[in-house]
Curated annotation (Swiss-Prot):
Protein name: Alpha-S2-casein
UniProt cross-references to InterPro entries, sorted A to Z: Alpha-s2_casein (IPR011175), Casein (IPR001588), Casein_CS (IPR031305)
Keywords, ordered alphabetically: Milk protein, Phosphoprotein, Secreted, Signal
Post-translational modifications reported in the UniProt record: There are at least three different forms found in milk, with varying degrees of phosphorylation. These include form 10-P which is phosphorylated at ten sites that have not been determined, form 11-P which is phosphorylated at eleven sites and form 12-P which is phosphorylated at twelve sites.
Subcellular location: Secreted
Stretch forming the signal peptide: 1-15
Annotated organism of origin: Equus asinus
GO MF annotations in UniProt: protein homodimerization activity; zymogen binding
A UniProt-annotated Pfam family: Casein
Biological role stated in the UniProt entry: Important role in the capacity of milk to transport calcium phosphate.
Source species, domain of life: Eukaryota
Length: 236
């Protein structure tokens, strides 16, 4: 117990000594700092020229500091403007390249269609050329359409009512007389048409024969019958 009490007392004494030493060192530091500050604030008598030079130097330093502070912003703005100006030419160049590519594609398409049109033109030239004449523009065959009149049917249609007339039925007789008048008018018109076509049968025949000799092209391989069908009017 005595040993333990002795050690505690020693520890307390050492701690007090350390605390006193630290406080003395701190006091000395504070005193030295106060002395340094007093030396700083001591006014040294100088002339007017030295005061002006120091003030001018301070002003120049302030100006330089302000300029140095502004310079990075100017550099940044100039760099940003240069980057923007570099971007615009690249976009223009890309647009020009796209337009050139588009024009090349259009030229290729035009050349392709020109070749197709030229091939179609050659095919049209190789096809047989058939010359159309005013006589066969609306007909597939070269023979004109001429009506044929059978006079047998007309005469029989006149004879049948005469045989079947009843003297007792007056109404039927009146109706048949009216029909016969219409038939007579119809027969007269048909006779006129036959007479008209009889005049033009021979010249038409010669024209058709001449057309079949000259219409076909020698390059064509298709063959047509040169014989012509001539209408015939039968009278009995």
């Amino acid at each position: 117990m005595k040993f333990f009490i002795f050690t505690c007392l020693l520890a307390v004494a050492l701690a007090k000594h350390n605390m006193e030493h630290r406080s003395s060192s701190e006091d000395s530091v504070n005193i030295s700092q106060e002395k340094f500050k007093q030396e700083k604030y001591v006014v040294i008598p100088t002339s007017k020229e030295s005061i002006c030079s120091t003030s001018c130097e301070e002003a120049t330093r302030n100006i330089n500091e302000m300029e140095s502070a502004k310079f990075p912003t100017e550099v940044y703005s100039s760099s940003s403007s240069s980057e923007e100006s570099a971007k615009f030419p690249t976009e223009r160049e890309e647009k020009e390249v796209e337009e050139k590519h588009h024009l090349k594609q259009l030229n290729k398409i035009n050349q392709f269609y020109e070749k197709l049109n030229f091939l179609q033109y050659l095919q049209a030239l190789r096809q047989p050329r058939i010359v159309l004449t005013p006589w066969d523009q609306t007909k597939t065959g070269a023979s004109p359409f001429i009506p044929i009149v059978n006079t047998e049917q007309l005469f029989t249609s006149e004879e049948i009512p005469k045989k079947t007339v009843d003297m007792e039925s007056t109404e039927v007789v009146t109706e048949k007389t009216e029909l016969t008048e219409e038939e007579k008018n119809y027969l007269k018109l048909l006779n006129k048409i036959n007479q008209y076509y009889e005049k033009f049968t021979l010249p038409q025949y010669f024209k058709i024969v001449h057309q079949h000799q000259t219409t076909m092209d020698p390059q064509s391989h298709s063959k047509t019958n040169s014989y012509q069908i001539i209408p015939v009017l039968r009278y009995f």
